[in-house]
Amino acid sequence: MQSRKTRALGKGRARVTSCDDTCATATEMVPDAKDRILASVRDYHREQESPTFVAGSTPIRPSGAVLDEDDRVALVEAALELRIAAGGNARRFESEFARFFGLRKAHLVNSGSSANLLALSSLTSPKLGEARLRPGDEVITAAVGFPTTINPAVQNGLVPVFVDVELGTYNATPDRIKAAVTERTRAIMLAHTLGNPFAADEIAEIAKEHELFLVEDNCDAVGSTYRGRLTGTFGDLTTVSFYPAHHITSGEGGCVLTGSLELARIIESLRDWGRDCWCEPGVDNTCRKRFDYHLGTLPPGYDHKYTFSHVGYNLKTTDLQAALALSQLSKISAFGSARRRNWRRLREGLSGLPGLLLPVATPHSDPSWFGFAITISADAGFTRAALVNFLESRNIGTRLLFGGNITRHPAFEQVRYRIADALTNSDIVTDRTFWVGVYPGITDQMIDYVVESIAEFVAKSS
């Protein structure tokens, strides 16, 4: 018997053409003029000098975008062609990004947080029938993380169930997830912390056993693998962020991916105002029966383009952002290699220093690291605040592990949630953990300066 979840799833001058209701204005330009402009953009890019690293003076940021000549040209070219609404670049990126993961559909949105909102909201759609999530249903998640992994549950009237994380990997473990399941549990939503995969295969099996949806927050982990398989391919839905701090960037942006055509259709509807029509922007009557529908209590033949099947949002991105994302897409592998190299150099350099718990990769994983987490030991002769302040005084950027134990924040004082087990490690993370950067813009010289600075501080403080 099928489970309820399975059942659910111009020459001489520019000539501007008219702007349709998507405002995707197009320009016809003499090719030579466009080529000259783009050549000048390349010249301009090459004239920009990369600053020489000066220890203690040049900032070492924990994260950032790495943009090259092709990225700059892609943005300018899209601007020249006045691609201002989501269009051809967006569709092409969605197709290529879905192919990268081996999934059927990808939908670009305006942020990773919006991607999380859409992913979980889609599971509440009436179109899923008895499988849909309803107010009061429970969603298991980790207590440590970024709030927008958790907020969509609250925003949909669901109940977050918090489990503790493991020190070192900073992920929730399968045994904790399994112990948290009750008759009210309907979904699991977890992030791969700082690019380090959670045990996705085992947790996916728990979800399957209990007929639960699994949503992977893959915002910090594009290119990471678990048991040889890309993170983001284990769940029913996966989300990605393209904010400049992340593995590739579109400036602002995000994406929801799925292997389910039914969920993809719901995602698209929720993203695009909740409308029932699936036409691309600027396109009408794809279904060839635009005025033949009779839905709800609307009069027969009501325009399908203005028929709404969900209480949705407008979370689309623009073609300029998609142009940058497309240019960045081919760099995922190189960026991942740089992140891994920087992480290893830090790990080797800091190994053996007293008072520091260094990060470890989840067994069977190959993380494309987002950051390098350090936890101060209980018996260290110094505090996190002292070390962080010392590093910041040397222009070495630091970050806490996002929200730490999210239940300790003012925003959650009036939120209904359940704690599945003691959040001991989550509190340790809140009190004693921080991270430094490994993104591709950090050089070996910078990594060595970070290592030297931490070693100097520990030697003086221990």
UniProtKB/Swiss-Prot annotation:
Alphabetical keyword list: Lyase, Pyridoxal phosphate
This protein's cofactor list reads:
pyridoxal 5'-phosphate
- SUPFAM superfamilies from the xrefs? PLP-dependent transferases
- Report the record's Gene Ontology biological process terms: polysaccharide biosynthetic process
Where are the active-site residues found? 246 (proton donor/acceptor)
Entry keyword annotation includes Metal-binding: no
Gene3D superfamilies, A to Z: Aspartate Aminotransferase, domain 1, Type I PLP-dependent aspartate aminotransferase-like (Major domain)
User: Where is the signal peptide, in residue numbers?
Assistant: none
Query: InterPro entries from the xrefs?
Result: DegT/StrS_aminotransferase, PyrdxlP-dep_Trfase, PyrdxlP-dep_Trfase_major, PyrdxlP-dep_Trfase_small
Thermal dependence reads: Optimum temperature is 37 degrees Celsius.
Residues the entry annotates as binding pyridoxal 5'-phosphate? 112-113, 220, 241, 314
Top-level taxon of the source organism: Bacteria
Cysteines engaged in disulfide bonds, as pairs: none
Q: What is its EC number?
A: 4.2.1.164
Q: Name one Pfam family in it.
A: DegT_DnrJ_EryC1
Instruction: Please write the reaction equations for the catalytic activity of this protein.
Output: dTDP-4-dehydro-2,6-dideoxy-alpha-D-glucose + 2 reduced [2Fe-2S]-[ferredoxin] + 2 H(+) = dTDP-4-dehydro-2,3,6-trideoxy-alpha-D-hexopyranose + 2 oxidized [2Fe-2S]-[ferredoxin] + H2O
Protein's job: Involved in the biosynthesis of forosamine ((4-dimethylamino)-2,3,4,6-tetradeoxy-alpha-D-threo-hexopyranose), a highly deoxygenated sugar component of several bioactive natural products such as the insecticidal spinosyns A and D. The catalysis is initiated by a transamination step in which pyridoxal 5'-phosphate (PLP) is converted to pyridoxamine 5'-phosphate (PMP) in the presence of L-glutamate.
* Subunit structure comment from the entry: Homodimer.
Q: Which family does it belong to?
A: Belongs to the DegT/DnrJ/EryC1 family.
State the protein's name.
dTDP-4-dehydro-2,6-dideoxy-D-glucose 3-dehydratase
Organism field: Saccharopolyspora spinosa
Q: Kindly list the organism's lineage.
A: Bacteria, Bacillati, Actinomycetota, Actinomycetes, Pseudonocardiales
